Amino acid sequence: MTTFYDGWLAASANAQKAVEHAPALAKGSDLNWIETPQDYRIAMLIGEQVGFPTMGTSLMKAEIPAGHHTGKHQHGEEAMHMLSGTGFSVIDGRRYDWKPGTTLHIPFMSEHQHFNTGDEPALYVSAMSMDLDLFVHLGRLVQLEEKGKNATDVESRFGKETSQFADDGRRIALHPEDWIDENARREAQRAAAASSAAHGNGHGHHGHDHGHGHDHGHGDGHGEHGAGHQAHRHGAIYILMGGSESLSDETNGFQAKAVAITNIFEETPKTRSHSHTHTEAMLYVLEGSGYSEVDGKRYDWVAGDAVHVPPKMTMHEHFNNSEQRTRTLRIEFGIRYFYEALWKGFHKVEHRLTAEAIA
């Protein structure tokens, strides 16, 4: 007779096998586009439904035709990044405008709908933890309205945008002109610290901790030297929603808990990023071509592809072997940090702290 304990043992073995033999690359050219009551075109990039073992998380890509809108629905937290098109979203009754490069946060169970008011399709990537929400029986997916063609008075019906922030003070929308250049800010901090020391006023600069209650001092050099003294991990880092791996605790006013589109990483031609090991994260390739090494295996990518770091201690780094810059969008999920705080062995490990040139 098979017992529940036998089932747990079998599930444990299957989970280990799944992450040890997990795919790491989703090709944008191979997506299976579908139509739903909510979306005209949507495809799963990374998720259990397309063969990636995740922590109940997913990354999708969707398209809104010109002059149309999505359905209106409610569900758990969502992070979105607009790739093309112009329009606005109505979230809990308030309008938030968007354009290419805008990052949006949908709070837990907020009513929301997206309107393409431009003359070209609007494309965006979306990250959620829907499978996790439903597994713990706290999440819901409530369809309130179906997709359709915009009304002729769509622009006036919802009024003008009055703020990028919700009534409770949290940020909902962030435009490219408001991205924070983390490397530039660290250089400014470094210069200020050097100037202060030269005038005899310095007491040492220790930078920021991550502001999330995690211990990141496990051989990564952050605790001793701080952000002001460490060389750069990428050619450029732009802070969007901020995250638990950032050298800064800056969140740009977002209050994401379950999912965040944290940063844009830029690698200059013929360079590679820092090398490290941690559990689940995702990258979406915005621009350029290159490759990632995940547990020693090479995965070549181009714009539109996505990289999955599976939920085990996975060593990885990213390479730009081209003559043009690359930009990738980093996505993290709160469930990762819940488990990292529980399990002492699952802290982030740095193998090489800085980006460097390649042949």
Positions of the model-derived regions?
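A short, N-terminal "cap"/entry segment at the start of jelly-roll beta-barrel domains
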Residues: 1-55, 139-257, 343-347, 352-359
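Conserved short histidine dyad/triad with adjacent acidic residue
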Residues: 41-48, 58-74, 241-248, 260-277, ...
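Short, structured motif recognition centered on aromatic/hydrophobic residues
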Residues: 57, 64, 79, 83, ...
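Conserved metal-binding segment of the jelly-roll/cupin
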Residues: 65, 91, 98-118, 127-130, ...
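A short beta-strand-loop-beta hairpin characteristic of the jelly-roll/cupin
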Residues: 68-100, 110, 275-303, 314
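Hydrophobic, ordered structural segments
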Residues: 98-161, 338-340
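Structured core of small recognition/catalytic domains
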Residues: 230-291, 295-306, 318
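C-terminal functional regions that serve as terminal interaction/effector modules
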Residues: 281-284, 297, 301-321, 326-358
